[in-house]
Swiss-Prot record:
Belongs to the complex I subunit 3 family. GO terms for cellular component: mitochondrial inner membrane; NADH dehydrogenase complex. It comes from Bos mutus grunniens. It is an enzyme of class 7 (translocase). Keywords: Electron transport, Membrane, Mitochondrion, Mitochondrion inner membrane, NAD, Respiratory chain, Translocase, Transmembrane, Transmembrane helix, Transport, Ubiquinone. It is a multi-pass membrane protein. This is NADH-ubiquinone oxidoreductase chain 3. It comes from the Eukaryota. Its EC number is 7.1.1.2. It is found in: Mitochondrion inner membrane.
Length: 115
């Protein structure tokens, strides 16, 4: 009985709100209010925007390094080892791996988007 009453109340309230919104007139209608706004860009213009592939590659590289740091760096402390040498060795290995991969990206000119 309570379920039926709750459903009936919700349905009635939703229907009432839809009817009120449909029948109320829009006040102060003018062209700027009814035109679409796309973050300062003209929505009626060309949909083709210039795309920088170098910037995209730098952004992807940043995301990869960021995920590596966020996911792999806590690994030595999450391994629950009591041996401090093992933990520090794992951490040092991961830091060296990140440094070597950063140096590789740098030498391959993967971090520059100006040519």
């Amino acid at each position: 009985m309570n379920l039926m009453l709750a459903l009936l109340t919700n349905f009635t309230l939703a229907t009432l709100l839809v009817i009120i919104a449909f029948w109320l007139p829009q006040l102060n209608v003018y062209s700027e209010k009814t035109s679409p706004y796309e973050c300062g860009f003209d929505p009626m213009g060309s949909a083709r925007l210039p795309f920088s592939m170098k910037f995209f590659l730098v952004a992807i590289t940043f995301l990869l390094f960021d995920l590596e740091i966020a996911l792999l760096l806590p690994l030595p402390w999450a391994s629950q080892t009591t041996n401090l040498n093992t933990m520090l060795t794992m951490a040092l290995f991961l830091i060296i791996l990140l440094a070597v991969s950063l140096a590789y990206e740098w030498t391959q000119k993967g971090l520059e988007w100006t040519e």
